[in-house]
Amino acid sequence: MVEVKKHKFPGVYIVIDDDGSEKIATKNLVPGQRVYGERVIKWEGEEYRIWNPHRSKLGAAIMNGLKNFPIKPGKSVLYLGIASGTTASHVSDVIGWEGKIFGIEFSPRVLRELVPIVEDRKNIVPILGDATKPEEYRALVPKVDVIFEDVAQPTQAKILIDNAEVYLKKGGYGMIAVKSRSIDVTKEPEQVFREVEKELSEYFEVIERLNLEPYEKDHALFVVRKT
């Protein structure tokens, strides 16, 4: 017998499987829609999508005991590197119809994969753009509550800072998935993470840093706040 209960983060749920193992899930905003072949659970008349931590760095962070999750119902999110929408679809479930995701993606081919998803998920606005040039999409993106970044670039930290400068509300939060090998393959991941933390701390208050193993190798997730 599968059971669903609320997670400590609003909009996130815990699914207790037949074998007693726990998984995380979000309540499907668009019942019947699957985004990346995820498992769907029906429970008390609602549909829940299992959030696969092997396919989503944010999912991995929650599974690893993330303490700060500023993405909440009704919030606006600038998502840098939205790709084909795997993680964004769960964020869309969490923020609900009152919330909004502005998703920046550099690759037209990848963005095209997002189109069928957003036809039903009107709280996602896909934008073709370059996250290293935040002024490019100024006409399309308002001030937001949260910026989430998943861009495998050497200048990852600078990208978050530059976008926060333009789009993040005062007191708003940034979340960044850092892949150490994208920044410097010659350094130990721990050294790269320390350098990223130092760079972020010059602009933000760094609230949390979390390793994403075993789901993602050489990755960490940082949560920061704009003061």
UniProtKB/Swiss-Prot annotation:
InterPro entries named in the record: Fibrillarin, Fibrillarin_CS, SAM-dependent_MTases_sf
UniProt-annotated binding residues for S-adenosyl-L-methionine: T86, T87, E105, F106, D130, A131, D150, V151, A152, Q153
Keyword tRNA processing: yes
GO molecular function: histone H2AQ104 methyltransferase activity; RNA binding; rRNA methyltransferase activity
Purpose of the protein: Involved in pre-rRNA and tRNA processing. Utilizes the methyl donor S-adenosyl-L-methionine to catalyze the site-specific 2'-hydroxyl methylation of ribose moieties in rRNA and tRNA. Site specificity is provided by a guide RNA that base pairs with the substrate. Methylation occurs at a characteristic distance from the sequence involved in base pairing with the guide RNA.
HAMAP family named in the record: RNA_methyltransf_FlpA
Assembly, per entry: Interacts with nop5. Component of box C/D small ribonucleoprotein (sRNP) particles that contain rpl7ae, FlpA and nop5, plus a guide RNA.
Name the UniProt record assigns to this protein: Fibrillarin-like rRNA/tRNA 2'-O-methyltransferase
